[in-house]
Curated annotation (Swiss-Prot):
PROSITE patterns xref list: GNRH
Note: Teleost species possess three paralogous GnRHs: mdGnRH and cGnRH-II have been identified in tetrapods; sGnRH has no tetrapod ortholog and is thought to be a duplication of cGnRH-II.
Biological function: Stimulates the secretion of gonadotropins.
Gene name as annotated: gnrh3
GO cellular component entries: extracellular region; extracellular space
Protein family per UniProt: Belongs to the GnRH family.
The protein's name: Progonadoliberin-3
Single Gene Ontology BP annotation: camera-type eye development
Cross-referenced Pfam families: GnRH
Record-listed Glycine amide modification sites: 33
Length: 90
């Protein structure tokens, strides 16, 4: 590799590194520094204040309804703890 091609490769590499280090990701609706634009916030508050409820369509599949079913995580039978308690008391 001659000197001129090495210089070109180094300049390109430097340009890529500078671009990656100086770029900033802006999420949708957010301004730099994590600030949200006031207009979008007002629109969100207005939408929440209307009281509209989003419901599932009537022809929702059984799989979708099963996925959205509530789970009872508190009353799960506690079989592990019951076995451990019986083992410790023996």
């Amino acid at each position: 590799m001659d000197v001129s091609s090495k210089v070109v490769v180094q300049v390109l590499l430097l340009a890529l590194v500078v671009q990656v280090t100086l770029c900033q990701h802006w999420s949708y609706g957010w301004l730099p520094g994590g600030k949200r634009s006031v207009g979008e916030l007002e629109a969100t508050i207005r939408m929440m204040g209307t009281g509209r409820v989003v419901s599932l369509p009537e022809d929702a599949s059984a799989q979708t309804q099963e996925r959205l079913r509530q789970y009872n995580l508190i009353n799960d039978g506690s079989t592990y703890f019951d076995r451990k308690k019986r083992f410790m008391s023996q």
